[in-house]
């Protein structure tokens, strides 16, 4: 069991301005800090992109959650709104990769992701906490977005300890009470765990953790001019975290032609048909489901 002492917990909402659950949870906690009180834990909440939240837009000029590459944080010539805001957050929460703070970044998605923890590293502390949360709520899934030899650019990468919470499905720009409450419960369960760690206790954990390891992203079918040529197949829509086998339908073209998954092994797609990913050329992320032993 990793015995890190957590100096402070930072909860970030509104990294994307049209994801309102995180924003309004942060506002709720800031209005009544006693909701987060734990005797051995200091917790602070902040809004990641206040201007985007004010305008109810994902971002002003570029995606804040892709602005945390270290070279970009050190490059003061980068002057777009979110690039500047990333530097502000880095000054508050950095240096990047520190292990003193624990960071929770709150997100929501139009995809049928349920309750998902997104890990951006293999730190044992994060894996243990993820196992604790999945043990207390089997509906929670764990997605590990790590790629070999590629630095992560997410807000949550500012700290070694922590992760993003992604909940859905929910349309952009609105609140859903059920997902709001489920996210709030996850936050409280996380703080309960961290409080135990700071007291020197070792919360009981399962011996294994099921996680979904990132493999690759898949784009939509496109024309030779780069225009959209199809959409998610009806048989795949909403089936996040369900197995996709070679030969299964994956896309339907505008001419009603079914395109089939041509991979050589079973994968588990997630973020299927996420609205914000159209501009990124991402129809879904493919993952591999695996059980890992906890040390």
Curated annotation (Swiss-Prot):
Catalytic activity: an N-acyl-L-aspartate + H2O = a carboxylate + L-aspartate
Coiled coil location: none
UniProt GO MF annotations: aspartoacylase activity; hydrolase activity, acting on ester bonds; zinc ion binding
Residues that, per the record, bind substrate: 58, 65-66, 166, 277
Gene Ontology cellular component terms for the protein in this record: cytosol
EC annotation from Swiss-Prot or TrEMBL: 3.5.1.15
Keyword Hydrolase carried by entry: yes
Gene3D superfamilies from the UniProt entry: 2.20.25.160, Zn peptidases
InterPro entries assigned to the protein according to its UniProt record, in alphabetical order: AspA/AstE_fam (IPR050178), Aspartoacylase (IPR016708), AstE_AspA_cat (IPR055438), Aste_AspA_hybrid_dom (IPR007036)
Residues holding Zn(2+): 16, 19, 107
Cofactor(s) it depends on: Zn(2+)
Record keyword Zinc present: yes
CDD domains (alphabetical): M14_ASPA
Cofactor note: Binds 1 zinc ion per subunit.
Entry keyword set: Hydrolase, Metal-binding, Zinc
Family membership: Belongs to the AspA/AstE family. Aspartoacylase subfamily.
Name by which UniProt lists this protein: Probable aspartoacylase
Native organism: Acaryochloris marina (strain MBIC 11017)
